[in-house]
Design a protein with these regions (language model features):
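Intrinsically disordered, low-complexity peptide-like regions
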Residues: 2-3, 141
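A short beta-strand-turn-helix
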Residues: 26-29
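Conserved AdoMet/S-adenosylmethionine-binding subsite of the radical SAM
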Residues: 89-210
Length: 210
């Protein structure tokens, strides 16, 4: 396949830069504790300094993979898929979610919301970042708002973002892993005073699973 053909297939969402895929237990937010197949796509320009998967940022370092091959692996393992990154909405998600739907797979996405929403989703976890704010139209679509808390200023940012989502959207505060011992007491106290929020933990890291 020549580079022009490959680029055309990537632009159409028929090839995606696959960093990794694995079957595991979801560790964060509303669906924590439930089994799901994860698809981690390469490519992200949001640039969070505390990102724990910076190797995902450069999409060119990850193989362009057919969505048919990706979905085939999903079908063998689970009836629920979580597409994450990187920032998956850098790519057209419509073809892969169509194929997943045709195979009765529930579709979840984890996104910063910095790019236009594409694809057909059962669950949208929106995790806004200060470096590159979400586009306005995605807020009303979010089922879950997950705010990563690195310092006290992030609580102000979280409150501001919570005003933009629908009243049915679930609200979570999650400590940034490297600062968890410092910020967890702050988050716990904040949630007790502001019970519209819930605490999210990266339980997969405590369990030492992917």
């Amino acid at each position: 396949m020549n580079l022009n053909n490959q680029k055309e297939l990537i632009d159409k969402g028929l090839l995606l830069p696959l960093m990794e895929s694995f079957y595991t237990i979801q560790g964060e937010g509303y669906h924590k504790g439930s089994a799901a197949f994860f698809i981690r796509l390469g490519g992200c320009d949001v640039g969070c300094h505390w990102c724990d998967v910076k190797e995902s940022w450069d999409s060119k370092t990850h193989p362009s993979t057919s969505i048919n091959d990706i979905v085939s692996d999903v079908i063998k393992n689970s009836d629920t898929v979580v597409i994450t990154g990187g920032e998956p909405l850098m790519w057209d998600m419509s073809p892969i979610t169509k194929l997943l739907r045709e195979n009765n797979i529930r579709t979840h996405i984890e996104t910063s919301g910095a790019y236009k929403l594409s694809g057909d989703w059962d669950w949208i976890c929106l995790s806004p970042k200060k470096n590159k704010n979400p586009i306005n139209k995605i807020y009303s679509k979010a089922d879950e708002l997950k705010m990563v808390i690195y310092n006290l200023d992030d609580l102000k940012f979280a409150e501001n973002e919570s005003k933009k989502v629908s009243s049915s959207c679930l609200l979570y505060l999650q400590p940034e892993w490297s600062k968890r011992e410092k910020v967890m007491p702050i988050i716990v106290d904040y949630v007790m005073k502001n019970p519209k929020w819930k605490v999210s933990l990266q339980t997969h890291k405590y369990l030492n699973i992917p």
